[in-house]
């Protein structure tokens, strides 16, 4: 179980997160909000890459910032398309990441081919990442995030900039990861999270304004029909994406 207790984050005088509290158990969660809401800051704190100004992040009751490598071994993280080694082949990139994650050498080959198969990239394994399409790059990031079968998977904008066909593939990959894992997906593409998330977390100006299932959110916010309408109720005419255009 992942718990966030009164997380606050300041960048100088700018308040990025304001007393955020959250409890996540197994399942897929969507972190939804407009640009500048604090989504990336929150995810960086959850992954241990950024310390909060105040508050605690607990994994099974233990402060993650005291756990070091033990917490990182439980975590899989896929940032937006950055940090990729374009001259590396897909298999070399995953081999490198498997070593960083501490996966024993004798287990790496089987694990790498498992995740490549999972994201349908076995045929592209020996191609340089620089030749991959945007969707392939996102899928190789998802693959490295699930290396070693982590208990917590954090995906930052996994469908950003992709065409509809690739977005569907990524959604299916994410849906199939679930089970005995906590999966947190940050996005501002409403349609990409509505169909797969157990619960939606709505974030605005560093605060959680609601957290519930999609049907419950629809009932609470004007008895509307879908998550896009909830978004409009909560955030007004701020930036909203349905996957093909901005409203």
Give residue spans per PLM region.
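Helix-to-loop junction immediately C-terminal to a conserved catalytic motif
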Residues: 47
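Conserved ABC transporter NBD signature motif
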Residues: 55-66, 70-71
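Conserved ABC ATPase "signature" region
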Residues: 95, 99, 106-124
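Catalytic Walker B motif of ABC-type/P-loop ATPase nucleotide-binding domains
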Residues: 153-157
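ABC ATPase "signature
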Residues: 211-212
